[in-house]
A protein has these predicted regions:
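Short alpha-helical segments used as structural interaction elements across diverse proteins
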Residues: 1-4, 23, 63, 76, ...
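Short, well-ordered beta-strand segments in beta-rich or mixed alpha/beta enzyme
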Residues: 2-9, 39-66
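Short amphipathic alpha-helical segments
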Residues: 12-37, 70-75
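Intrinsically disordered, low-complexity acidic/polar segments
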Residues: 15-17, 49, 61, 97
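Short conserved AdoMet
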Residues: 30-33, 57, 83
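Glycine-rich beta-strand-turn "strand-cap" elements at beta-sheet edges
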Residues: 39-46, 76-98
């Protein structure tokens, strides 16, 4: 299992469009084979910055998602709303405390 973090900066007047679309597709993303967890965060100081935080079984699962029709549809819509190039990291969890 690993964590995928994606940072996105949106045009301020496009934030609501992004949130509406995310609401419509979030369960499809979460239920994609290999996805264990999905969260969306908004920066406290800059409302144009959002992060997705997702857990994936393995890199193959993430690649299957990234090559899926679902991803293509979501990403094509979402990237038109950006005000800056997105950034993404695949990371291994080292320590987790609850």
């Amino acid at each position: 299992m690993f964590v995928r973090i994606v940072k996105m900066r949106f045009q301020e007047d496009k934030i609501n469009l992004f949130l509406e679309n995310f609401e419509a597709v979030k369960h499809h993303i979460r239920n994609f084979e290999g996805n264990q967890f999905l969260e969306l965060y908004q920066d406290k100081n800059d409302k144009c910055i959002f992060f997705t935080y997702s857990f994936w079984d393995n890199e193959e699962s993430l690649e299957n998602y990234r090559n899926s029709d679902l991803f293509k549809e979501v990403w094509d819509y979402t990237k038109a709303l950006f005000s800056a190039k997105p950034e993404a990291w695949s990371v291994d969890k080292v320590v987790s405390l609850a």
